[in-house]
Amino acid sequence: MGIKGLTKFIADAAPNAIKEIKIENLMGRVVAIDASMSLYQFIIAIRDSEQYGNLTNESGETTSHISGLMSRSIKLMENGLKPIYVFDGAPPELKGSELEKRGEKRQKAEELLKKAKEEGNLEEIKKQSGRTVRVTKKQNEEAKKLLTLMGIPVVEAPCEAESQCAFLTKYNLAHATATEDADALVFGTKILIRNLNANASSTSQNKNKNSSKRGYILTEINLEQVLKGLNLNMNEFIDFCILCGCDYCDTIKGIGSKTAYNLIKEYNSIEKIIENIDKNKYQIPSNFRFVEARDSFINPKVLSKEEIKIDWGEPKIEELKNFLIKDYNFNEVRVTNYINRLLKARKVTTQRRLDNFFTACTKKSTKLVNEESQIKKEVKPKRKGKKRDAPNDSSTKLNSKQNKKPKGEKESKTEKDDGDTHNGNDNEEEGGEGETADMGAKDPFDTEEDEDNPSVNFFHHKSDSESGNVKKESTEQEANATPTGDVYSFPNGKDASGSNIHLSSNSTLHSCNNLNGDKAINESMHVVGSSAPEAGNNEIGNGDLFTSNAADCVNNNTDKTQAEIEMKKKNISFLLPYCPKNVTSVKKRKSVQRC
C-alpha cells in the first residue's frame, strides 16, 4: 500500500520535488528495482486477451512474469539503464495485520471473479482477476534464475525490498529506487522512480498514457526537494507519513494528509500531537504502535554495504536458451531475438551520459602557483596582464627567456610523450568494435578495481608543471587566489601535481579516488569549506559523475551542438580528457581548456 495519499500531497504542497522524465534521462544510471512489485505488474499486464488469464507453458505453469521480466530488462538496458533487482525477504511482524487485510480482500475478489466468469462479464473478469494476483515463492525463484542467466545483479533483502533499495541509494550503489510504493521515500531513498514498468509489454491490452508520442514518461520524486518543499526534517516527515497511514500500524481516524501535515508543523512529533489533540474529535487507536513503526522506517532490517555483492556477470547464453526453450516452451526464434537484443543492450550501457564526459576545469595547485610566481620574479613579461595565445606558446616563450635551461629540455620531451599518448588514443578509436582508449577502461559490468591501471590514468594528462604548459596569470593576486567553485582533485584530496587542495567556503571538492565505472560515482564527494576531506562524506549532486572511458563520446560521434548546449548550461570552462576533435570552444563563454 505504501503511504496513503502521499504522492498527491507532495504534488500539491511540494511541486518542485516531482517531475516527469524520459527513460533516456536515466542513461548510465544504476537503478534499484523492487522485483516483487515488477513481477506483480508483469503478471497483471501480460494476460490472455480472451479470458485475461496468465500466459502459461504446455504444463500450465505461468510464464507471464518471465516474459515480462526478460522483455522489460532488455528494454531498460537498451536505453542505457543498469538495473539491480531487489527481492523481498520475510515480511516484518508489524505488517501482519495489513497482510491479513490483503488476504481478505483477495478472497473476496476471487468470489467476484468466479461470479463474473459464470456471467461472462469480461470487464468484471479483467477487474477482479488483477485483484487476485499474488507473486508466489516459485515465481520469485524463477525470476532470480532468469536474471542471473542474463547477467543482471540480484539482491535478496532480509526483509522489505523497498527498504533495501533505499539503502542502496544511501550506500551510493544506486542512483534511484524504482517502485510504486511511496514508502521508499520514508526509508530514505534519495530518488524515487515511478512508472518504470508502465506499458510492460506490447501484449498488454491497455496502452498506458505515458507511452505516448512524447516518449516513455516516468515520474521522479526527489526526497531532498520533498523535505525542502514541506519544510520538514526527516524525523518529522516520517511521523507525518505514519499519520497519513502506513502498512505498519493503524492511524488516527479523521486525520488525513492535510490535517497530519498541519499537526506535525505545529507539534513536530506524534507524541506531542497525542498530548495536545482533541480526544473527543479524534479517536486514537488502542494499539497505536507508532513508535515501533517509526523505528521500522529509521532502522529497517537491511543488508549492510559490505554484505551486498553486485555481480554484473556475463550472460550464460546456452543455459538461458535451455531455461526458456526447454523448461518454459518459449519459441526458439523469439528467444534468439531476445538474446541478440540482450547482447547489443550490454554495449549500450557502455555509453556514458554527456554530463559524465565533461568535468569542471581543474584549479591550479599551490605548488604550481608558487612555481609561476617564481618565474614572474625572474622574468618580467613585456606587458602585464597580456593574454597568452596558448599554454604551449607561453611556456615556449618563457623557456626562450630562460636561456634554454635543462628544465626546458625535459619539458620538450614530456610534450612529445603527451603527443604520443593522444596518437595512441586515436589508434584505439580506429580499432574494431568494443575496443576502448588506453585509459584503464573496463567492461561496464566489471566493478573490481584495476590495480595495474590506477584511476589517475583516467585523465591521462600531466600537470602543467610536468608537461611544460606553464601558464602566466595577469596579476600576482590572481595567481595566488584561493580556488572557488568546483575543484576536481586526484586521490586523497590532492590536485594533478600532488599538492594539497585549498578550498574557499564556497568551494566543492570532488575527490576522485576511483574512476572506474560506477565506483567513480560512489566515491565522489562534496566537501564544502574544508581542505581536509574525509572519506564517507558521500553527497552526490546532479551531474557530479565521471566516466572511465571519455573516448566513448568520441567513438559514438558526440553531437557537437548538444555538447555545446550542455557546456553553456554549466557556464564554466571544462577540461576534456583526450580532447575529442569534434567538440570545440563555446563562443562568448570561457574557452575549453585542452588537455
Swiss-Prot record:
- Give start-end positions of Acidic residues composition bias: 426-436
What SUPFAM superfamilies has UniProt attached to this entry?
Answer: 5' to 3' exonuclease, C-terminal subdomain, PIN domain-like
Q: What CDD domains does this protein map onto?
A: H3TH_FEN1-Euk (cd09907), PIN_FEN1 (cd09867)
* Principal EC category: hydrolase
Localization of this protein: Nucleus, Nucleolus; Nucleus, Nucleoplasm; Mitochondrion
Residues annotated to bind Mg(2+) 1: D34, D88, E160, E162
Cofactor names? Mg(2+)
Q: Which GO terms describe its molecular function?
A: 5'-3' exonuclease activity; 5'-flap endonuclease activity; DNA binding; magnesium ion binding
- Stretches the record annotates as I-domain: 124-267
Q: Which GO terms describe its cellular component?
A: mitochondrion; nucleolus; nucleoplasm
User: Which residue ranges are recorded for the region named Disordered?
Assistant: 370-493
User: What is this protein's record name?
Assistant: Flap endonuclease 1
